Amino acid sequence: MHELSLCQSAVEIIQQQAEQHGVARVTGVWLEIGALSCVEERAVRFSFDIACQGTLAQGCELHIDYRPAQAWCWDCSQVVEILRHDAQCPHCHGDRLRVDTGDSLKVKSIEVE
């Protein structure tokens, strides 16, 4: 379950930012999950709760935003959105795609008191 290590890294970033800015408590966190990141929402929510224990983010509300991946098609030279690794180009139906974005988990925003 790699979701736990991803969430631990995200919480470290959140904790560092909160401490740097003298925040008393983190009340909300917005994560962006790419379509090709291979993480499951239930596992992320469970892991995030565990990773937040004993931090300024403990008990905060978690918001998750899913983003499609972007890829470059070598056959028609178009940037396209894809949702799966085995996707074909929607323009030319080629399968020679280079994934550029959408395979990560990012902390997009935090809400604080």
UniProtKB/Swiss-Prot annotation:
UniProt binding sites for Ni(2+): 2-3
Alphabetized UniProt keyword annotations: Metal-binding, Nickel, Zinc
MF annotations from Gene Ontology: nickel cation binding; zinc ion binding
Residues the record lists as binding Zn(2+): 73, 76, 89, 92
Signal peptide positions (record): none
Superkingdom, natural source: Bacteria
Sequence similarity: Belongs to the HypA/HybF family. HybF subfamily.
General function of this protein: Involved in the maturation of [NiFe] hydrogenases. Required for nickel insertion into the metal center of the hydrogenase.
Protein name, entry field: Hydrogenase maturation factor HybF
The species this protein was found in: Salmonella typhimurium (strain LT2 / SGSC1412 / ATCC 700720)
Gene symbol of the encoding locus: hybF
